[in-house]
UniProtKB/Swiss-Prot annotation:
Family assignment from sequence similarity: Belongs to the class-II aminoacyl-tRNA synthetase family.
Record-level Gene Ontology MF annotations: ATP binding; glycine-tRNA ligase activity; protein dimerization activity
E.C. number: 6.1.1.14
GO CC, alphabetical: cytoplasm
Localization annotation: Cytoplasm
Chain sites annotated for binding ATP: 198-200, 208-213, 328-329, 443-446
BP-aspect Gene Ontology terms: glycyl-tRNA aminoacylation
One Pfam family linked to the record: HGTP_anticodon
Organism taxonomic ancestry: Archaea, Thermoproteota, Thermoprotei, Desulfurococcales, Desulfurococcaceae
Primary location class: cytoplasm
PANTHER family: GLYCINE--TRNA LIGASE, GLYCYL-TRNA SYNTHETASE/DNA POLYMERASE SUBUNIT GAMMA-2
The protein's name in its UniProt record: Glycine--tRNA ligase
Annotated keywords: Aminoacyl-tRNA synthetase, ATP-binding, Cytoplasm, Ligase, Nucleotide-binding, Protein biosynthesis
Amino acid sequence: MAEDLFEKLVEIGKRRGFFWPSYEIYGGVAGFYDWGPLGHLLKRRIIEKWRRYFVLMHQDHVVEIETPVIGPEKVYIASGHVEHFTDPIVRCTSCGRTFRADHLVEEALGINAEGLSVSELDRIIRERGLRCPVCQGELGRVETFNLLFRTQIGPYEGSVGYLRPELAQGIFVAFKRVYEAMRSRIPLGIAQVGRVGRNEISPRQALVRLREFTIMEMEYFIDPEDQWGSCPFFHRMADSKLPILTYEAKRRGEEKPESFKLEEAVNEGVVISPCLGYWMAVGMRFVEDLGVPSDSIMFEEKGPEERAHYSSQTFDQLVKVSRWGWIEVAGHSYRGDYDLSRHMKYSGQDLTAFKPYPKPIVVKKRRVVVDKAAIGRALKSRAKTVLEELGRMGEGELERLAASNRAVVAGVELPPGSLRIVEVEEKVSGRRFVPHVVEPSFGTDRNVYVALEYAYREVEGRVVLAFPRDIAPVQAVVLPLVENDEKLVERARMVYETLVEAGFTVYYDDSGSIGRRYARADEIGVPAAVTIDYQTLEDGTVTLRDRDTWRQVRIGADEVVDKLRRFIYDGARLEDLGTPVKP
């Protein structure tokens, strides 16, 4: 049976140093992969490209921070992950193997089981007589499994912590500090790139489903009453095309996306926020710039039963790959005020933003007046506890209490008339609000795999990884025409050192025939080869070879840095850089 593309990439990955299973000498552990020298470079360049698209091009509104990998339990109780971050599992009663229940149902029956409840999955397994795919044993009951990696912080029992499953919570907890440091401006984007962990039940798709991986994520904080004003760069992408498969279209059985202009998608309510739509359009450009054609990208809207607990609307950004079909490479979510409101409630801290009015205005407000003297006289020793509890209450809670016939605080009934609602006039200079959040979140490792797959070519029996030039792990190779000529080697070494000092990632190769060396460079995606030949010794010129066309031009050795920079970063055509070399 012929190798499929995934198997070819796995072979190259191991042999040339892109990636391989972690802990191989101990048999490996599912869901963990190492990035080798070339894979690490490729991943780093993709991260830098993401930073360019999401941070640097929006740096007047977006900043980047770094937060801890481990967080205390109370953070993840507040975020809802302790309660909601679960997947359904089912165990074989014979061999003891554990499977993710919805995936087992999908693979056995060819249906979409995402979002089905535990009881629905259990019913399907019983009614359809599904058995263990490994030993054909009987399957047990479907249960839920929490995907958080649990740990202990310090030597203290009960000090529970979790490895972060996303970068978002570190950003939300740090929001107030960043907001104040950025002079209290909204909109505000806070980006972060870092490692996360999810204790996946049965990861079986190599780099596509890992237990530890890198995320590139941004939380974009906006004023919910000024959605358009919160996206000052919308015009940059207004005419961009978004291929969207809506939830309603999925329910009708449709599988192909419909193309929407960004502005059209927002105005028609397909995307509920211009900010959400804008970052989707940026995400489209980013993935295209990894070498993925637009017809292999789409956005799939998730239904209410499929969305995460914090989301009002979510679109998965999908890319079509050879082995698994459509896979998610990013999630775009409108998280509303869920996260900041939860952290305000559990921490007791004010995480609101303030928007000043053009000039102060006078407004009428209802206020609750607490008669502390009456409470003190009536409750005596218990008054202190009651007053402290009243001090922690918000205005809305106090108003509800004052309006009730029988007000009870800290288990004590308040004396009649001790809480009064009055109407007052106040001069206000602005309004406070809980910012809403739009989140683009990209799985770095999946995007690296996608870049590898779409770069793969076979040309005249040779493998070429035709990466976009600016993400190629190695940018150039320097080659003396022959390895045993001291003068050629000396000049080649000089060119190599010049490129290294100029900041390029470059390697030197003088082993084997020149054709074999070109092939080695093509196989790892090196976009440019600089060859030092006998003409170099005569007139000081070298050849610059294009990986994708195999054509060459002659340029001055003293021009190599400038010409290579234009070729790699500016997308210059080879023919515009020098004099063509006849084949």
